[in-house]
């Protein structure tokens, strides 16, 4: 390989490659292995810094105590790999694992669930291995994908799948606090629009959008609606503005949603920052 040998389609199933050194010290990128079969290969203590593997299989291979810093494992079967004490800093497994990609494109629901189950197991192993190395940013991404695979195995119209999707949408299974912030800002803005057209009460005066009013007057009222929406979302309730008519429904919904959204943000943020 170092002398330009063939690196495509190697059949190394069950091969004993203990301590193998494939570090490319003469180039900026690691060696490239394409469509290689390393099923149950023994790669204990191997030096694979920067290795690039595309396609093929590492299924049930033993990479215990190996060095996979900056390795690229794209579209590779990683099911059942032994990751004990494997160095995984900056490991790149692509946007999706091979089983994940195949499961999403599979039309047979039974076979798709098989792919998703294998993908879930692989993501779980990667998550545990990265946690063992203290790489919590990487483990956070893998736990999101693991739980996504678990959701995709559920019946399409089931309550549990819908609930799991909602949790993923709002906070990325506890790994994306910025999603909570964006949802909060979006809800505040949308509710302010409803208040703008449904009206508010201020000091005994009924305020509502009026087409005959000047642009400046309507713009000021829109800002007041935005202020009231923020106050309602955070459940401060100063009492200067009060909802009337349909605005009461939106205010009650916003206050209810805001109370647990703020609590959710605190939980997600603390979880993310204390790792």
Which residue stretches match the model-derived regions?
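Pore domain of cation channels
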Residues: 212-275
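Coil-to-alpha-helix initiation sites in intrinsically disordered, low-complexity, charged segments
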Residues: 96-98, 151-165, 217-224, 244
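Tandem repeat scaffolds
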Residues: 1-142
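Alpha-helical solenoid repeat scaffolds of the TPR/TPR-like class and their adjacent stem/linker regions
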Residues: 110, 122, 148-156
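Extended, hydrophilic extramembrane loops/domains of integral membrane proteins
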Residues: 136-154
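Short amphipathic alpha-helical coupling elements at transmembrane boundaries
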Residues: 141-144, 168, 251
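Outer-pore turret/helix-boundary of cation channels
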Residues: 186-225
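Transmembrane alpha-helical segments and their cytosolic interface motifs
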Residues: 155-199
